[in-house]
Amino acid sequence: MRELVNFDSDERLRVSVEDKALVSVSQKSGKTKQSKKEFASETEAKKACAKKEWESLKKGFILQDSEAKAGKASLHVYIGGGYTGALSFTSVKDEIYVYKCGGQKDGDKHSDILVRLDKSGAIKEQIALPKPLAWHAEYASENLLLDLDHEIYIFEPNEAKFREILAEQNVKKSSEIASFICTSNDVAVFGMFGHIFTFCEGKISKFSEYKCSTKNYVPILCAALSADASMLALCTKENELQILNAKNGEILSELRAEFGVLDKIYFLDDETLLIRQYLENKLFCLDIKSAKVTKQPWIKDEYLRASEFCVEAGKLVVIDQSRGYAINLKSGNAMAEFRLDHVVKSCEAKFIDGKLAVRTDYGCFSLYEI
């Protein structure tokens, strides 16, 4: 059933289109109210229905659909405060933490926060961040790792406290302002100010360093961990990528090919990387042994411009602004083609419990069935 729920007022609202009419059914305190409004066409009625849902979301309602089919949203929560490039979120056990950009200061304090949701979409807590701009958020070893304006912090949910890694590890700020966080197998590797650390079982260890080249004055930096967290793929130069031992920093191989500047990489397996070209947003595969760049048959032309992509359990989702494509990596077959709601230009996407989780620049956090 698709309905809007307000946990604060205990109101439930269902909006639907019947022929050329918008039908609204509201339930609150045991009372039911129904209204019906006619429109000139079914198209106009559908537009009014979408507008009604959006207005309700902004008023604190949560959209839930227990019968959502593939490519459809089973959850919409209005978070607000979307900021292009900083749309981070991550899941922690049965909860989801979503970054919200406050966009203003209260005295000397920034109003940027982490919104803690349960799996029903109910907002349980809003946590003030020690710094603004959460560019990235990941989960490992029962902790959140946050890239706050290129400084890494660890948030311990059980203790409800932030750890400032810059001070803990006595890291000195440098001209290497680009940073990263990547996780796999409950291990995190992160980099800031030219230093690379691993975070495993609650312990932090430095194991390598990096120096970024630039392209059009923008630092080149992206990284990924292999499935077992034994290898780190690191790109800091145009047409060049290193594979490091993620425990001791040993360079296992250096790959050089005409793939340009990369801004996102992912280990498909121990021998293949899925890579995305900076600005072009084109997806390719890179063979780690031969350093050959290939376009696999499942990389269709219609989703070569990947503004976002994510992979889990043999499934690839490619997003081009508001269009989404789900692909079975084993067969190469398309599983679903769908449109994302509430996207202006960009979003961040991850898999959470088999569903596609999306944080959009228009202010929503959503779950889609895949």
Functional labels for PLM-detected ranges:
Residues 9-35:
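Short aromatic-glycine-(Arg/Gly/Cys) micro-motifs in beta-strand/loop hairpins
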Residues 72-82, 122-128, 161-173, 204-215, ...:
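A short beta-strand motif characteristic of beta-propeller blades
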Residues 78-112, 132-133:
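Beta-strand-rich domains and repeat architectures in extracellular enzymes and scaffolds
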Residues 96, 144, 187-188, 232, ...:
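Hydrophobic beta-strand positions that form the internal "hydrophobic ladder"
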Residues 118-121, 156-160, 200-203, 245-249, ...:
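Short loop/turn segments that connect beta-strands within beta-propeller blades
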